[in-house]
Protein backbone atom coordinates (compact mmCIF):
# COMPACT_ATOMS: atom_id res chain seq x y z
CA UNK A 1 0.00 0.00 0.00
CA UNK A 2 1.26 3.48 -0.83
CA UNK A 3 -0.04 6.55 0.97
CA UNK A 4 0.86 10.20 0.43
CA UNK A 5 -0.06 12.96 2.87
CA UNK A 6 0.38 16.65 3.57
CA UNK A 7 0.03 17.61 7.23
CA UNK A 8 -1.25 21.00 8.32
CA UNK A 9 1.56 23.57 8.57
CA UNK A 10 0.02 25.65 11.37
CA UNK A 11 -1.83 23.41 13.84
CA UNK A 12 0.37 21.40 16.22
CA UNK A 13 -2.64 19.40 17.43
CA UNK A 14 -3.74 18.75 13.84
CA UNK A 15 -0.35 17.20 13.04
CA UNK A 16 -0.47 14.99 16.16
CA UNK A 17 -3.97 13.79 15.29
CA UNK A 18 -3.02 13.26 11.63
CA UNK A 19 -0.18 10.95 12.68
CA UNK A 20 -2.48 8.98 14.99
CA UNK A 21 -5.14 8.68 12.30
CA UNK A 22 -2.72 7.53 9.60
CA UNK A 23 -1.16 4.93 11.91
CA UNK A 24 -4.59 3.62 12.92
CA UNK A 25 -5.77 3.36 9.30
CA UNK A 26 -2.58 1.67 8.13
CA UNK A 27 -2.73 -0.87 10.95
CA UNK A 28 -6.35 -1.79 10.17
CA UNK A 29 -5.98 -1.86 6.37
CA UNK A 30 -2.45 -3.15 5.81
CA UNK A 31 -2.02 -5.75 8.53
CA UNK A 32 1.32 -7.45 7.92
CA UNK A 33 1.65 -6.40 4.27
CA UNK A 34 4.21 -3.80 3.12
CA UNK A 35 3.26 -0.13 3.26
CA UNK A 36 4.92 3.16 2.36
CA UNK A 37 3.80 6.58 3.65
CA UNK A 38 5.31 9.65 2.01
CA UNK A 39 4.67 13.34 2.14
CA UNK A 40 5.17 16.80 3.51
CA UNK A 41 4.59 16.16 7.20
CA UNK A 42 5.51 19.71 8.30
CA UNK A 43 7.30 18.20 11.31
CA UNK A 44 10.91 17.53 12.25
CA UNK A 45 12.32 14.41 13.85
CA UNK A 46 12.04 15.88 17.36
CA UNK A 47 8.26 16.36 16.98
CA UNK A 48 5.64 14.27 18.79
CA UNK A 49 3.90 13.44 15.50
CA UNK A 50 7.19 11.97 14.17
CA UNK A 51 7.47 9.86 17.34
CA UNK A 52 3.95 8.58 16.73
CA UNK A 53 5.01 7.37 13.28
CA UNK A 54 8.16 5.58 14.41
CA UNK A 55 7.33 4.49 17.97
CA UNK A 56 3.71 3.33 17.81
CA UNK A 57 2.62 -0.27 18.34
CA UNK A 58 2.34 -0.46 14.54
CA UNK A 59 5.78 0.91 13.77
CA UNK A 60 7.01 2.65 10.63
CA UNK A 61 10.68 3.23 9.82
CA UNK A 62 12.08 6.48 8.45
CA UNK A 63 13.70 5.41 5.16
CA UNK A 64 16.38 8.08 5.54
CA UNK A 65 17.73 6.31 8.62
CA UNK A 66 17.33 2.75 7.34
CA UNK A 67 20.38 2.79 5.09
CA UNK A 68 23.96 3.95 5.25
CA UNK A 69 23.48 5.06 1.65
CA UNK A 70 21.43 8.21 2.16
CA UNK A 71 22.87 10.88 -0.06
CA UNK A 72 22.23 14.47 -1.04
CA UNK A 73 20.98 17.26 1.17
CA UNK A 74 20.16 16.75 4.87
CA UNK A 75 17.08 18.99 4.53
CA UNK A 76 13.94 19.04 2.38
CA UNK A 77 12.36 22.49 2.85
CA UNK A 78 14.19 25.53 1.49
CA UNK A 79 11.33 27.96 0.68
CA UNK A 80 12.57 28.53 -2.87
CA UNK A 81 16.18 28.86 -1.65
CA UNK A 82 15.25 31.65 0.80
CA UNK A 83 16.33 29.50 3.79
CA UNK A 84 20.03 28.86 4.27
CA UNK A 85 21.00 25.18 3.92
CA UNK A 86 22.44 25.51 7.43
CA UNK A 87 18.98 26.33 8.83
CA UNK A 88 16.69 24.46 6.44
CA UNK A 89 14.64 21.67 8.06
CA UNK A 90 13.85 18.14 6.93
CA UNK A 91 10.04 18.01 7.03
CA UNK A 92 9.34 15.55 4.21
CA UNK A 93 9.63 11.86 4.96
CA UNK A 94 9.34 8.39 3.49
CA UNK A 95 8.12 5.95 6.12
CA UNK A 96 8.08 2.19 5.47
CA UNK A 97 6.84 -0.82 7.39
CA UNK A 98 9.58 -3.07 8.84
CA UNK A 99 9.06 -5.65 6.06
CA UNK A 100 10.25 -3.14 3.42
CA UNK A 101 14.00 -2.99 2.82
CA UNK A 102 15.49 0.43 2.06
CA UNK A 103 18.36 0.14 -0.43
CA UNK A 104 19.06 3.85 -0.80
CA UNK A 105 17.61 7.20 0.27
CA UNK A 106 18.38 10.49 -1.45
CA UNK A 107 17.35 14.14 -1.08
CA UNK A 108 18.08 16.26 -4.14
CA UNK A 109 19.91 19.54 -3.64
CA UNK A 110 18.02 22.46 -5.15
CA UNK A 111 19.72 25.58 -6.42
CA UNK A 112 18.24 28.91 -7.57
CA UNK A 113 18.60 27.75 -11.18
CA UNK A 114 17.45 24.16 -10.57
CA UNK A 115 14.27 23.92 -8.53
CA UNK A 116 10.79 22.59 -9.03
CA UNK A 117 9.26 23.33 -5.62
CA UNK A 118 9.88 24.93 -2.25
CA UNK A 119 10.88 21.41 -1.13
CA UNK A 120 13.72 19.21 -2.29
CA UNK A 121 12.66 15.96 -3.96
CA UNK A 122 13.20 13.00 -1.63
CA UNK A 123 13.29 9.47 -3.02
CA UNK A 124 14.23 5.98 -1.92
CA UNK A 125 14.97 2.65 -3.60
CA UNK A 126 12.86 0.04 -1.82
CA UNK A 127 12.76 -3.74 -1.93
CA UNK A 128 9.51 -5.55 -1.19
Task: Describe each PLM feature range.
Residues 2-5, 22-50, 63, 95, ...:
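Active-site beta-strand/loop signature of hydrolases that rely on acidic residues for catalysis
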Residues 32, 43-115:
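Active site of divalent-metal-dependent phosphoester/diester hydrolases
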Amino acid sequence: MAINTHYDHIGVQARKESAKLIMSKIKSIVGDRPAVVTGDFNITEDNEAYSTMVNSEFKMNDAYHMTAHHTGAPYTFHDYCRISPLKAPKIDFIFVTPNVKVLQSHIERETPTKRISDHNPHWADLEF
